[in-house]
Amino acid sequence: CWFVQLSSIRLFEVDGNYTKIYFEDQRPMIPRTLNYLEKRLDPKTFFRANRQQIINLKWVERIEPWFSGSIKIYMKGGHEVDVSRRQTQRFKELMSF
């Protein structure tokens, strides 16, 4: 059992019927969907990048253009997240690009 501050969570990622939580060097799984989590997380801090991942915007290290108008986000700690084209537009609006 973990009690984790939301600020230390880098990302949530689908893993079968579970969601994997990335923080520090831990990756526990919880029996919740990303849709369930997305409704409960602060949208100013957490962003649904694609069908498989929700990222913590405070852990974003850099952003690069990617294929077909989408973007790739490089997270502190080494994770790379491909943002879907649809979510790329939302991300640009959110970040005021």
Indicate where each model-derived feature is located.
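Conserved binding/recognition cores within well-folded domains
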Residues: 1-82
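Eukaryotic intrinsically disordered, low-complexity regulatory linkers and tails enriched in Ser/Thr/Pro
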Residues: 75, 85-97
